[in-house]
Amino acid sequence: MTTQRSPGLFRRLAHGSLVKQILVGLVLGILLAWISKPAAEAVGLLGTLFVGALKAVAPILVLMLVMASIANHQHGQKTNIRPILFLYLLGTFSAALAAVVFSFAFPSTLHLSSSAGDISPPSGIVEVMRGLVMSMVSNPIDALLKGNYIGILVWAIGLGFALRHGNETTKNLVNDLSNAVTFMVKLVIRFAPIGIFGLVSSTLATTGFSTLWGYAQLLVVLVGCMLLVALVVNPLLVWWKIRRNPFPLVLLCLRESGVYAFFTRSSAANIPVNMALCEKLNLDRDTYSVSIPLGATINMAGAAITITVLTLAAVNTLGIPVDLPTALLLSVVASLCACGASGVAGGSLLLIPLACNMFGISNDIAMQVVAVGFIIGVLQDSCETALNSSTDVLFTAAACQAEDDRLANSALRN
């Protein structure tokens, strides 16, 4: 009987709800820190191992995902998706810009073990641009070893375009390697409850329970900014497109797409739900069959918010000054980073080091910021995915309805 129960228990742990397991890890970590401070400090090793695993897998993840995405792009797909693509890009940038404003209005700080004395902050936008350009020409092996994500992106894009001219066997190999790395990332993230248990325990034992308020404030800023985008920014963009009350469409998409995405925590997994909603709205099949999968890849407003808010929280913690041009550049960089976060649970968190590179923040400190993101990720990742996925179908519907209105008005004039 014992041998039959063990596999069942292991299967439940391996395939159970990650959100529930992280919640359990949070609660157990808080309890251990409250009961025994020495024991809580000792289990901090679990958190250290988890962060180390993230540091190891993040650079190769970015390289393979971007390279495979570009290499396997299909040629000759003729669909009328330019307005939708424009809305995707504009919405993602608007979300990053809103996150910058929100972060300046409600500044947050993090509890990081490294001091600001190890940081060499850039003096302004000129130095930031110089650092970006120099990072772009880094040796690819050196970029992978040192976590230079800007250099990794440049090499991934270049190799991706080069491989588009390769044969199908090569493209399939790159795609298989990308899937293998994604599997490794999922494997690491399955250990998130244990890692977060160690991180929460050691953090509370070291800094006290006041740390929870810092995380709570950060979570309020993140979720508040996502609500602002979902209920203010997106409706404005939809109104600009369809020129009528956008809220019936906005609320429908949040209810019938966002709720599902909140629990699945994957834009890719929510694609069938969005397809069904598009069919229910009588949208053009040739359009939404392309725009919905495309949106699951590049329409990442929630990810842009997460990257921007957590990066500026780290910058604020380390006392690095940020001028307006640098903040605007961060919005652009965060928007570009967000496009690489598709289909991976916690993907936006793993791309935070790229944005942190702008401010001279080391990879070690950046991965501590990622760890903080995992601690609050129970709600953050769910809200982020709900915003991302519901916006896919929202912008598709807005563009299709605007095109239908244009054709109808054109027919009336004739």
Curated annotation (Swiss-Prot):
Topological domain ranges for the Cytoplasmic compartment: 2-15, 67-83, 164-179, 239-299, 353-414
Compartments in which it is found: Cell inner membrane
Main location: membrane
Any one Gene Ontology BP term: threonine transport
Keywords recorded for this protein, A-Z: Amino-acid transport, Cell inner membrane, Cell membrane, Membrane, Symport, Transmembrane, Transmembrane helix, Transport
Periplasmic side: 37-45, 105-142, 201-217, 321-331
Catalytic activity reported: L-serine(in) + Na(+)(in) = L-serine(out) + Na(+)(out); L-threonine(in) + Na(+)(in) = L-threonine(out) + Na(+)(out)
Transmembrane segments: 16-36, 46-66, 84-104, 143-163, 180-200, 218-238, 300-320, 332-352
Membrane topology designation: Multi-pass membrane protein
GO cellular component, one term: plasma membrane
A molecular function (GO) term: neutral L-amino acid:sodium symporter activity
PANTHER family membership: PROTON/GLUTAMATE-ASPARTATE SYMPORTER (PTHR42865), SERINE_THREONINE TRANSPORTER SSTT (PTHR42865:SF8)
Protein's name in the database: Serine/threonine transporter SstT
Species of provenance: Shigella boydii serotype 4 (strain Sb227)
Lineage: Bacteria, Pseudomonadati, Pseudomonadota, Gammaproteobacteria, Enterobacterales
Encoding gene per record: sstT
